[in-house]
Amino acid sequence: MLRLAGEEPIEARAVGESYMRDGVEDVVFCYLRFASGLAAHLHLSWLDPHKERRFTVVGSKRMATFDDMELERKVTVYDKGFDQSYRSYGEYIARSGDIWSPRISNEEPLRIECTHFVECVRSGEQPRSGPESGVRVVRVLEALQRSLEESARAAAV
């Protein structure tokens, strides 16, 4: 998500609930705010009865979803949104256009990642997600953990 955003969040909030064991959250809701105005909402749960790995992006012109559990249509792009009407202030016209799904390889992501890592070790090339990427992810995870421990108080990243 950080790569897609092109920036790190400036604020992270998390709230969770422990149902099975005290101190270990089974369900967590997160909110990330970015300097550009971008926001991300996450729902994380190992306890949820439905296994989901879905990512939704809502943009000003189109929307897209990535669903890793889907076999045929992992990515779906929606030409859907709202266009501002200039007849009067604050009016919007709903726009709903085409929906399409580009063909995406059905290879297992972990296999691709491991193969790429081994190739980089052998060739000396830099991996697509190197140590800097890992540091950025851990920084966000630590901020979310701090927020979780402080009852969803916003934590600087």
Where on the chain are the PLM-derived regions?
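A general structural signal for well-ordered alpha-helical segments in protein cores
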Residues: 1, 111-115, 141
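C-terminal glycine/acidic-rich active-site capping loop/insertion
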Residues: 34, 61-129, 153-157
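Residues within well-ordered alpha-helical secondary structure of globular protein domains
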Residues: 3, 123, 140-143
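Rossmann-like dinucleotide-binding domain that binds NAD(P)(H)
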Residues: 1-39, 44-50, 56, 69-70, ...
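Stable alpha-helical structural segments in soluble proteins, enriched in small hydrophobic residues
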Residues: 109, 141-151
